[in-house]
Amino acid sequence: MRDWQTFPDLQKKKVSRDHLNCPATMAGSNVLWPILLAVVLLQISVAFVSGAASGGVVLSDVNNMLRDAKVVTSEKPVVHSKQETEAPESSVELLRFVDDDEDSEDISSIERQDGRTMESKKMADQVRLLTKQLNALMLRRREDYEMLEHNLRKSLRLTTNANSVDADMRSELNQLREELAALRSSQSGNKERLTVEWLQQTISEIRKQLVDLQRTASNVAQDVQQRSSTFEDLATIRSDYQQLKLDLAAQRERQQQTEVYVQELREEMLQQEQDFQHALVKLQQRTRKDGSSASVEEESGSQEANQEQTGLETTADHKRRHCRFQSEQIHQLQLAQRNLRRQVNGLRFHHIDERVRSIEVEQHRIANANFNLSSQIASLDKLHTSMLELLEDVEGLQTKMDKSIPELRHEISKLEFANAQITSEQSLIREEGTNAARSLQAMAVSVSVLQEEREGMRKLSANVDQLRTNVDRLQSLVNDEMKNKLTHLNKPHKRPHHQNVQAQMPQDDSPIDSVLAETLVSELENVETQYEAIINKLPHDCSEVHTQTDGLHLIAPAGQRHPLMTHCTADGWTTVQRRFDGSADFNRSWADYAQGFGAPGGEFWIGNEQLHHLTLDNCSRLQVQMQDIYDNVWVAEYKRFYISSRADGYRLHIAEYSGNASDALNYQQGMQFSAIDDDRDISQTHCAANYEGGWWFSHCQHANLNGRYNLGLTWFDAARNEWIAVKSSRMLVKRLPAVECQANASASGAFVSVSGSAADAAPSSGATTTTTTATAAPATVTTPKTNNSVVQFVAAGQA
């Protein structure tokens, strides 16, 4: 707020307030009223100009000013009433100085009328001047309105330019989308790197533009602050105007009071004049009465007349002295009034001239400031509109970028995931290549051995064929000889000779047959022992495979007479199940699940029979690795894992759970394996048929990793009471250390002994049957068995 130092006219007004309180200066206040009216009109014009630029802020202030003016005018009758109530007291005080002279009152009234006529003429001139100034202000306001219209048209043109900028931004966004589509379709790393660098550059440029926008916004904020300071200056001017208005109202009140006082003095003087005339009339009547009765009562009333005459003379002297004193006081008052009037006129004209000059200077200054403010406000409005449009465009671009950035991140994450998959597949392919090379080397060795064995088998088969031909030839000879012998036996003289020949023939043929059979059996046993030696040299599981990387390896589980190709990890885990893309069909029969299916490098099931032999001694643990559709990794590990035999339905046995996934397999503890053609669950529905996959079902969906892909791969999370939607899964088996195996064997010795005896009984019975059949028919039974095992080994090596 500005103080009184910045407004010298107002300071003079404040200083001369004591002079204006005088009744003589009240007449000059009538001249100030049109000047203050001009100031009000000027303030209203400034308010209109500033309101055209700044909205309705200043208009509200103008409304407040008009409301205050209404309040002041409404309060005026109350002031008059107060003055009327207070007037009698002041009139009583002024009666002391009233004179009975009519001439002085007439002179003062004539002078007042002359002063009023002069003041009315000056007021008319001032009103004309104010009308001219108002006309000039109206012309300026019209020019300002035309300027505002021009600025609005420019702002509309800027909005059209903003539409073109918006079209450019849309075209750039379309280009970004096309490049994003190209980036999605392309697979080369250089293009992706270049697009990512381009995106980084564009984002950095956008950030720089945002910094520039922030700077311009700060500049605009400074301009707005300056504008607010100008508004504060206008508020100070407005407050000064309010103060002037209050001073004007006070001067009006004082003027009205003086007018009331003068009117009361007039009335009192008239009343005194009437009283004086009545007193003269009474004196004349009394003198007449005294003249008529003077002759009669001259002598008697001479003394009384003398007394009355002396009393009248004393009263007349007193009145003369009082009138003389009043006339002297009135003359002094008139002189003082004339001096005061001269001083007031001089001060008034001087003050009015100074005030008019100051008002004109202030008017010119306000007009210049108004013009500057209007131009600045117009430029600020342009800048504000352009900034708003630019901010809207930037916000739109930012929202679009915010919407496109997650898509880009999603696409980049997809590309990274695809790249990771490709790298993992490449590593797997490399591992598979190295493993294939190793397996090829092993197979080359085994094939060379098999070729040698095949040569031996060919020789053996040739020998067998030769033996068969010899046996057939001998059999035909024996038959012919027997026929001849029978014919000779029919003859009596040749019977003794036939008996001698028949006695010699078995002795000659039996050594040949026995030698051939023994050589054939020995060669076949040699081939079988070599095959079993090759099988025994293979590792029983992946814990015996010493490798530094994950890959495919040949293993031979305990009790199995043919090798098995499976995936092994570097830390000795054997992969028994894998799901990740739904490429393999897991809706298979119970026999297929028992034998196993799929490719070890992709989706596959190792087979329930192989699981039984891998976990036969109850010394294995199971680890289930899962990844849900939100890329969360879940692990469930069981320290004890065992699958029973085929006769028991491959029953599930687990214990000692750990991991971040829930113990969902515990709901299926002790359940037999179910498939689409063999329902062994305890549910009323066919779980394997409904969810299209074999599993150890109890009540269907507590855990199922062999169901239909994207439909039936689930794992129940008891902590959250919801199912995990599994995207990929892997089941791994590993043998426990020897110490833990002994502890588990001692803890479950009975169960292991029973299962072990059953498992041992089956091979022993098979061995006995094999030996008996081999001894009974060595040439027809043993050879096909050996050939089948060799064929199985060769097929496994080729796989």
Curated annotation (Swiss-Prot):
InterPro entries: Fibrinogen-like_C (IPR036056), Fibrinogen_a/b/g_C_1 (IPR014716), Fibrinogen_a/b/g_C_dom (IPR002181), Fibrinogen_C-term_domain (IPR050373), Fibrinogen_CS (IPR020837). Residues 489-498 have a biased composition (Basic residues). Possesses five pairs of dibasic residues that may be the target of proteolytic processing. Residues 533-737 form the Fibrinogen C-terminal domain. Disulfide bonds join C542-C568, C687-C700. Keywords: Developmental protein, Differentiation, Disulfide bond, Endosome, Glycoprotein, Neurogenesis, Notch signaling pathway, Signal. Involved in regulation of neurogenesis. May encode a lateral inhibitor of R8 differentiation. In conjunction with Gp150, promotes Notch activation in response to Delta by regulating acquisition of insensitivity to Delta in a subset of cells. This is Protein scabrous. It comes from Drosophila melanogaster (Fruit fly).
